[in-house]
Amino acid sequence: MNTTTDRYLTRRGVKNLKKQVTKIDKELTKLENSLKTTEASKDSRFVIDNILSRIEQLKSEKREIKQVLANSKVLPRKRDRLYVALGSIVDLIDAKGRLMTLMIVDSIEANPSNGKISANSPLGESLIGKTIQETISLTIGCRKTELQLVAIR
């Protein structure tokens, strides 16, 4: 994981990462207790190895999340709504008149099924810096799509 660049996260994104750390801490505590009881009962070495492996995996995940949190900045609540930037919520209309609402986030928070797209994605890159009423042309594979930017929140 690249630790030298700052990431910009929403307040909710920071909160979710902190919840993940808490969840990992709870699971680590359970596994460490389980390891003690397993060692006391002299169960098979296979079970102990599995527990130790899981503990190492969780500690690694926790380190990565803490590193992301240490190198992250929270997006400001107020920003210029005249142009699309990281943290903007945008409304787009496609050629068929369908409305899409998307939030521009850092890649770590991206979840297209929940309407959060990465600023580094093709659509995210096309939107950054645009203003209301601009048309965004996007080519995916052989298909060219045009979207109208109708609102920035």
Positions of predicted regions on the chain:
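C-terminal tail/sorting-segment detector
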Residues: 148-152
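Non-DNA-binding regulatory cores of transcription-related proteins
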Residues: 76-143, 147
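N-terminal intrinsically disordered, low-complexity, charge/repeat-rich segments that act as generic
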Residues: 1-71
